[in-house]
């Protein structure tokens, strides 16, 4: 559980079932969770709401581009962005981190790894998480 509550977490994923489950997980610790389902809503929400953290599915955009991440970084340079994905290949992780992600969490381990990743990026810490490092990567 975080030391101080977040005012807002922005959750972006096209898959409604997953977002509902993640919202429940995040609300147990953080309170307000705003859900969006597309790139335009992510950019609008990030700019308008100024959330503390954004948890975003790597495949949010229909194409396999990380342009949304670069756009979020331009609009909200201090926003902590955690990318979630079904892909766990090192090349995918590296691409997300190089595009500006603060952390990367594999979806198959999201129930155990998301909250520790949020806490790590919130604290500005880098390096390995307390969970399996194969599942969570934090920007160094």
Model-derived regions, located:
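Short, conserved "switch-loop" micro-motifs in signal-transduction and mechanochemical regulators
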Residues: 87-88
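Short hydrophobic/Thr-rich beta-strand motif most characteristic of the beta2 strand and flanking loop
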Residues: 30-38, 45
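Conserved acidic segment of CheY-like receiver
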Residues: 5-17, 22-23, 35
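C-terminal output helix
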Residues: 91, 109-119, 130-131
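CheY-like receiver
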Residues: 118, 125-140
């Amino acid at each position: 559980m975080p030391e101080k509550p977040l005012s807002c977490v922005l959750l972006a994923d096209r898959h409604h079932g997953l977002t509902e489950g993640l919202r429940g997980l995040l609300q147990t610790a953080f309170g307000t969770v705003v859900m969006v389902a597309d790139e335009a809503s992510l950019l609008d929400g990030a700019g308008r709401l100024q959330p503390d953290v954004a948890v975003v599915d790597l495949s949010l955009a229909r194409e396999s581009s990380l342009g949304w991440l670069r756009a979020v970084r331009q609009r909200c340079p201090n926003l902590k962005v955690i990318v979630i994905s079904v892909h766990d290949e090192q090349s995918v992780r590296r691409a997300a981190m190089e595009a500006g992600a603060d952390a990367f969490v594999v979806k198959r381990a999201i129930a155990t790894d998301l909250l520790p990743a949020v806490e790590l990026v919130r604290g500005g810490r880098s390096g390995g998480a307390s969970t399996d490092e194969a599942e969570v990567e934090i920007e160094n």
